[in-house]
A protein has these predicted regions:
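Secretory targeting signatures
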Residues: 1-25
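Hydrophobic beta-strand segments within beta-rich accessory/binding domains
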Residues: 48-71, 113-118
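Surface-exposed coil/turn segments at beta-strand junctions on protein surfaces, enriched
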Residues: 40, 50-54, 64, 97-99, ...
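Intrinsic-disorder/low-complexity, polar/charged segments enriched in Ser/Thr/Lys/Arg/Asp/Glu/Gln
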Residues: 42-48, 54-58, 101-103, 112, ...
Length: 148
């Protein structure tokens, strides 16, 4: 029995991905958000999430139609500044200003965070039109946020 266990462990060390499967079983990926929705012009989506320990966060976003958007992840305090269109700080590894698609991953400390999908003029991407037109330059986005 010990010989079989030793052989199994040896194979896991040699075979790529084997230990990843073990880690996934011990620490499974947790889905925080998964949606396909519209963001109207001059509006944003606020996604608040909390992690209890350092975790790897993955954000996948795909703009399916409409203008580019801003994707920001920040603390709650910085979200308050963002809402006022004041200068704010965001987590660069989990943010992508003026984007059409993002596939981000970073390990961050425990805490409460806010991810914003922004179709306003507070970020780098600017909805077209402005005061010239009454058209709603809404954006359709598909997004998923996970923690592991």
């Amino acid at each position: 029995m010990r010989a079989k266990l030793a052989l199994l462990i040896s194979l896991c060390v040699v075979l790529p991905g084997c230990l990843d499967d073990v880690n996934d079983a011990v620490n499974p990926e947790q889905e925080l958000f998964d949606d396909n929705t519209f963001v109207n012009e001059d509006e944003h989506i606020k996604l608040t999430w909390t992690i209890e320990s350092a975790s790897t966060i993955r954000i996948d976003l795909d703009r399916q139609e409409g203008p580019n958007i801003d994707l920001y992840t920040m603390t709650e305090l910085n979200y308050e500044k963002y809402e006022e269109c004041d200068s704010f700080v965001y987590l660069a590894d989990l943010s992508d200003p003026n984007t059409a698609a993002s596939n981000l991953e970073a390990t961050i400390d425990a805490g409460t965070y806010v991810t914003v999908i922004d179709n306003t003029d507070c970020g780098e991407a600017q909805p077209p039109g402005g005061l010239i037109t009454d058209d709603n330059d809404r954006v359709r986005v598909d997004y998923r946020i996970t923690a592991q």
